[in-house]
């Protein structure tokens, strides 16, 4: 019989997911994808464009290290052959997707996003491809000069792209966790009201309430889940707004609660009578949480709700049934 260890760590699920995601990234966005693309290109035409876009001194520096210039410098021929490689050059220069493509604080190059994500260039992107490459080459030249004291190598350039990929993968994992949490809360509500459901769709549940008026439980962009009573055709009484914060990082939970407060303030303006916030951390300072989101009527733990048992789940269930005006499921005889 083995003695239980005093120290236990959770399984490295995030790193396992990252390993598979990185494999996909390498095949589409990283250096191996660039090398595969260049292998099938007209090298004479590629060299002609490189001599046009890249300063001669930079070409000489790369040649000194036995490197081809397209490893660092973007030219139209490469991006036309494989539009996904826009992602390679973005990552190499250290720009996040939000920073690069963002509508409010981005670089004004949102029209190129479909190249990276879908491998397709729209009319606006095609028209501005020259300017994009000029801008990339200027930045690449600054990067080459900045790392001058180091020996530039394929390995170094690959490492630089990975430094940008890491936060992007983590951000994607966080977004997926957030989406999964919202779906879980929606599913828990669906189970609670299933016996009174008139219609269940992918993004909404319609239930028959005791008032005789339909009640809709729906996914929404902001807040995450809403419950509304239909007074007459296309006229609603807003009942409950639910914000789900699925992140498990305790150090960041108060920022997330602040985000929930902004959403709930909007919900109050829209006439929602109840605002709930579901969180996914083990220890929450309720005094601080209530001060950060005074609009939140009830805080719930995602873990407690997912158990489908216990005082917290029972309170959540009672309130859902009460505010949707439907009776509890009849007990089995």
Swiss-Prot record:
Protein name: Type II restriction enzyme XcyI
Required cofactor names: Mg(2+)
InterPro entries for the chain: Restrct_endonuc_II_XcyI
Domain of life from the UniProt record: Bacteria
Subunit structure: Monomer.
Pfam families: RE_XcyI
Bridged cysteine pairs (disulfide): none
Keyword Hydrolase applies: yes
Listed GO biological process terms: DNA restriction-modification system
Organism, as annotated: Xanthomonas campestris pv. cyanopsidis
GO molecular function: DNA binding; magnesium ion binding; type II site-specific deoxyribonuclease activity
């Amino acid at each position: 019989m083995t003695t239980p260890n005093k120290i236990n760590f959770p399984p490295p699920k995030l790193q396992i997911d990252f390993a598979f995601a990185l494999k996909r990234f390498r095949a589409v966005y990283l250096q191996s994808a660039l090398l595969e693309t260049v292998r099938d290109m007209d090298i004479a035409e590629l060299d002609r464009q490189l001599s046009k876009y890249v300063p001669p001194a930079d070409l000489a520096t790369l040649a000194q290290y036995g490197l081809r210039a397209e490893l660092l410098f973007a030219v139209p021929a490469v991006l036309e052959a494989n539009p996904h490689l826009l992602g390679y050059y973005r990552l190499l220069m250290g720009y996040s997707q939000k920073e690069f493509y963002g509508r409010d604080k981005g670089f004004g190059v949102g029209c190129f996003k479909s190249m990276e994500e879908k491998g397709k260039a729209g009319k606006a992107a095609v028209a501005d491809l020259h300017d994009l490459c000029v801008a990339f080459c200027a930045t690449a030249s600054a990067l080459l000069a900045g790392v001058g004291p180091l020996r530039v190598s394929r390995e170094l350039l690959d490492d630089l792209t990975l430094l940008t990929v890491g936060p992007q993968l983590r951000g994607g994992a966080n977004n997926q966790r957030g989406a999964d949490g919202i779906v879980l809360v929606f599913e828990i509500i669906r189970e609670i009201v299933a016996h009174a459901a008139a219609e269940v769709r992918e993004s909404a549940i319609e239930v028959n309430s005791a008032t005789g008026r339909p009640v809709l439980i729906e996914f929404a962009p902001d807040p995450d889940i809403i419950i509304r009573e239909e007074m007459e055709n296309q006229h609603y009484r807003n009942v409950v707004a639910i914000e789900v914060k699925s992140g498990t990082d305790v150090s960041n939970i108060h920022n997330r609660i602040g985000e929930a407060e902004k959403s709930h303030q909007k919900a109050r303006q829209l006439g929602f009578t109840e605002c709930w916030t579901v969180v996914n951390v083990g220890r929450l300072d309720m005094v601080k949480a209530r001060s950060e989101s005074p609009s939140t009527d009830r805080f719930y733990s995602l873990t407690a709700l997912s158990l489908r048992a216990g005082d917290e789940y029972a309170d959540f269930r009672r309130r859902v049934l009460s505010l949707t005006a439907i009776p509890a499921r009849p007990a089995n005889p």
